[in-house]
Amino acid sequence: MDASSARPTSPTEPLRIAVMGAGAVGCYFGALLARAGHQVTLIGRPAHVQAVQQHGLRLETAALDVQVPMQASTEASAVRDADVVMFCVKSTATEEAAREMQPHLAPGALVLTMQNGVDNDERVRAVLGPSVAVAAAVVYVATAMAGPGHVRHFGRGELVIAPSALSEQVARQFGAAGIAVQVSPDVRGALWAKLVINCAYNALSALCQLPYGPLVQAPGVADVVDDVVAECLAVARADGVTLPGDVPAAVRGLPATMPGQFSSTAQDVALGKPSEIDHLNGYVVRRGEALGVPTPLNRTLQVLVRLAPSRVQASQAPRNPPQNS
């Protein structure tokens, strides 16, 4: 069966969904889908899985605070029988996670790559081969894990996904669960637009351990952000990518909409975890090298984040800050 063959499911029948990499993003969307009647299995770390198995997933938003009964597992084999796999691992773990789940995927399953960066769908497709349907998804949501089995939502919650045999059905079913989904043939442009925003703020927030509002108020930071964005846009143009909307305006407006938010890279650095910097600013650097476009600021930010202390004092670390996936 090739990737164009959809798994036979009724347009109204509940979906079987596996979340590969059950962090804040996957848990939030998974909880909404489970509340809507879909069969959702979270695949994550032992402490988180144990909490969900014992108590369900605690979903905390501005409007509600509920326990959502869900299945959970630490094993990649739990993707078996899933109609849709929400692939939410860090970009640093893409190939490894894809290899782990490959033997267990059901024929006709759709893998949605819901990650930072612009090439995860290509990397997953290279591992899984042409027989598996893989569609990129752009995620717009602010969420954070407040502890094992506890996800907090701070704002937004939309997806833009690439076309596939199942994408329209997924959009309808997700929409009925309260998740706004747009199926777009220009997901690459949307992924790049989000990449530019991430390149502008993620590294700076991580290096300074500051949320976006105070960060951009510091003298000179706004100019640095503008220069980083200019480099990214130059690489995108050279790569033949058309970005939707006014990306520089979106970058400038972000701190006002979420002034208290730390970047996901800031949280990774604070906790001593591997960051995705090589798939954010580092990706722009690599494409710039290949296309002959200089990217000195993006390179500097990439190197500095790599050199950042592996762990900061607990008093300096952000306390469960919302993460802009």
Predicted regions and their residues:
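NAD(P)-dependent Rossmann-like dehydrogenase/reductase catalytic/cofactor-binding core
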Residues: 2, 175, 226-325
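Rossmann-like NAD(P)(H) cofactor-binding subdomain of soluble oxidoreductases
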Residues: 29, 64-150
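Short phosphate-binding/catalytic loops that engage adenosine nucleotides
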Residues: 38, 179, 241
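Rossmann-fold dinucleotide-binding core
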Residues: 114-194, 200
